[in-house]
Amino acid sequence: MKKYNVLGIGNAVVDVISQSSDSFLNKMNIEKGIMQLVDRERGELLYNSMGNRNQAPGGSVANTIAGVGALGLKTGFIGKVGNDELGAFYRNAMEENGTDFVNESIDQSDLPTSRSMIFVSDDGERSICLLYTSDAADDEDSVD
């Protein structure tokens, strides 16, 4: 069993950031300047419509753990990601930044990784559409 100075349990959410015009926001019916939850169908439509996107692992616990790890402590994170491209990205990015991703991806191949789609307007305003698809490690089977 590995030992950590700090181990966090939280929601694994990929932050996906893209520059977007006001006309794009209007066309996609995204209300400017707010955060809104979206269902899976709308979330996948919005994600696929994002051009030139940047991605980063996110979620408040994961961000905190990454910061602690940057100070030199041994860190681990427990959270659920889908068995998909974004899940692999999340896991790899956390580990490349020095934080162990402790648990396995969820087996349900049809459940995608959670994502926060951040549309940044020309004036710097952020409009966020959040697709939550999996909770943090919410049962004893999630952790060895």
Feature roles, as predicted:
Residues 115-119:
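Short beta-strand scaffold segments in enzyme catalytic cores
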Residues 71, 111-114:
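Short, basic and Ser/Thr-rich N-terminal targeting/leader segments
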Residues 9-11, 80-83, 120-122:
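Cofactor-binding loop segments of dinucleotide-utilizing enzymes, especially the Rossmann-like FAD-
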Residues 1-78, 88:
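Glycine-rich phosphate/adenosyl-contacting loop at the front of the ribokinase-like
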